[in-house]
Amino acid sequence: MRHTYACAMRWADMDALNHVNNVAYADYLREARLAYAEEAGVRARPMTALAIDYRAPLVFRPEPVLVTTTVEDDVLVQEISDRREDGTTTVYVQARTTLADGAPPAPLRPDEALTGRLPVAGRARDLGVDGDVDQVATLELLQEARVAYATVVGARGLPWVVVRSETTFVRPLPRRATYAVHAGIGKIGRSSFEIVAQLVDDAQVFASSRNVMIGFDPEAGRARPLTDGERTQLEPHVVAG
């Protein structure tokens, strides 16, 4: 089944560049999932994993953006795009959402190699109707930690963009005044590097993420190689594996 949903945009969805914030994309995907579940007459299920590829920036406008959803067993394949009258299409996001199948999650212990420690303050609006942190809000907590960690490793303020985000939701996250995120640097490529993180509470992992960042040349509008200086800043924080 293929479902198409016209998702309204909000000014609050924008980032400092007037592009849709990465977490807002996840909100659009959720709106489309709920619309699909209602139309198909199936129960909306929580996510266990979400992988997002960011293909192009989306700027604010009053018209909605289209979200298509295709079902593959317990996986929803989704795409956020515009289709024009001349037949051309601009794809902004491609995503794969794995839905919970009812099996209890396997416990996951914190990775001691992730030596970055980032406290993130909670807010009441982070909570869902069940009293736990909403899954999209979980992405926002991880995003806050990622931005803070970029400062720790000396990458804050440099021209980077996130091109891929992988998040695993291990267990429901209870309300806390402050959440602990452990972070480190994953693979370093020619023009990219990874930030890996775990959202931890009481020696348990509640969510984990891996984000691929690329160096970006804003004048040329394309990826750029990492400089020797940037590699020198990142390499001490690389985690094994």
Task: Label every model-predicted segment.
Residues 131-220:
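Structured core of small recognition/catalytic domains
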Residues 54-64, 70-118, 173-175, 186-241:
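HotDog/MaoC-like acyl-thioester-processing domains
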Residues 2, 45-47, 111-113, 160, ...:
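A generic structural signal for short, non-catalytic loop/turn and secondary-structure boundary residues
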Residues 11, 54-58, 124-126, 165-171:
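Short, well-ordered turn and helix-capping elements at secondary-structure junctions
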Residues 7-9, 27, 52, 69, ...:
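Preference for bulky hydrophobic residues occupying beta-strand positions
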Residues 18, 45, 131, 160, ...:
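Residues that recognize and position ribonucleotide moieties
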Residues 1-97, 178-180:
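Ordered, small/hydrophobic-rich secondary-structure cores
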Residues 1-35, 39, 103-154:
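Catalytic strand-loop segment that frames the active site of acyl-thioester-processing enzymes
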